[in-house]
Amino acid sequence: MTKENICIVFGGKSAEHEVSILTAQNVLNAIDKDKYHVDIIYITNDGDWRKQNNITAEIISTDELHLENGEALEISQLLKESSSGQPYDAVFPLLHGPNGEDGTIQGLFEVLDVPYVGNGVLSAASSMDKLVMKQLFEHRGLPQLPYISFLRSEYEKYEHNILKLVNDKLNYPVFVKPANLGSSVGISKCNNEAELKEGIKEAFQFDRKLVIEQGVNAREIEVAVLGNDYPEATWPGEVVKDVAFYDYKSKYKDGKVQLQIPADLDEDVQLTLRNMALEAFKATDCSGLVRADFFVTEDNQIYINETNAMPGFTAFSMYPKLWENMGLSYPELITKLIELAKERHQDKQKNKYKID
């Protein structure tokens, strides 16, 4: 059987660099190497692209994926053809955060006309920017908690007015978030104005735009969505925390979370969550994969929190576990995502690019 040629891209110039490497390790160890000839491209923290060809062995440690000593090559040269001498059947970007899941690298793949796994430029960019995402959810009629957003330059000029707006519109606790970052990097839970000021200072280290959201006493529920024009959603899972909130450290370092799959919810609530996840997928014109995150209160009020256009595939990750619960194994999920990438690229070839 002739193998298909796949290139996995990971690392990136982002605060989520190490998360991306951990995700790549998981995918490389799960992908069907009898079916796929796999090359990898590691993007350093400085933005250099380094390639290693024909990965066949198990990746024991993420240290093996820090290709710091390889030759930095031109991007177009790296993606022109695989180490087998044939064009890539698909590129699998496992990049998190800015410069990875925000539409930038998706635009590069579009220009180079290579099939790639996951969301396109528009859906990746709008899912990364929490303010734009919330505005699209609002247009779709999806219920959300109150929030405000502002820029670093606005805060530098109008700090007093912005703090007053937060205190007038929202009730503590509030969550301060960089608008364009994931994996809970830079997020703070604030119980008073002093903590709010510190949270704003922390978040502005990572982005020029912030979103401050109303806190709520609720369960954190997640739904995985898979597909292109006709997506499917899983039954919901729940994040059970042994911490104040689900931050970067608890997600990836401490392991102080448990995933309950499926979530213990009434069937009508589960169905509503699945339908809302599909609506969120459509609201941002997604393709491939999305994880939709919700809050569910004690009286079963549902609020959408966000969509994640490139959910992680680490040992703690909800997305693959939700599909395993639906009968789709991790290797099968990876194969399905590659097939969806090829399907979308084939559909794109139906477009005309010149007028007769």
Swiss-Prot record:
Which parts of the sequence bind Mg(2+) 1? Answer: D293, E306
Recorded GO molecular functions are: ATP binding; D-alanine-D-alanine ligase activity; metal ion binding
Residues that bind Mg(2+) 2, according to the entry?
E306, N308
SUPFAM superfamilies reported for this sequence: Glutathione synthetase ATP-binding domain-like, PreATP-grasp domain
Q: In which pathway does it act?
A: Cell wall biogenesis; peptidoglycan biosynthesis
What biological-process terms (Gene Ontology) are attached? Answer: cell wall organization; peptidoglycan biosynthetic process; regulation of cell shape
Q: Does the keyword Acyltransferase apply?
A: no
Enumerate the UniProt keywords alphabetically: ATP-binding, Cell shape, Cell wall biogenesis/degradation, Cytoplasm, Ligase, Magnesium, Manganese, Metal-binding, Nucleotide-binding, Peptidoglycan synthesis
As its record notes, the protein acts as a catalyst of: 2 D-alanine + ATP = D-alanyl-D-alanine + ADP + phosphate + H(+)
Listed EC numbers:
6.3.2.4
Superkingdom in the source lineage? Bacteria
Every copy of the ATP-grasp domain together lies at 134-339
Compartment(s) of residence: Cytoplasm
Which EC class is the enzyme in?
ligase
> How many cofactors are bound and how?
Binds 2 magnesium or manganese ions per subunit.
Q: What family is this?
A: Belongs to the D-alanine--D-alanine ligase family.
Q: What does this protein do?
A: Cell wall formation.
Please identify the protein, giving its name as recorded. D-alanine--D-alanine ligase
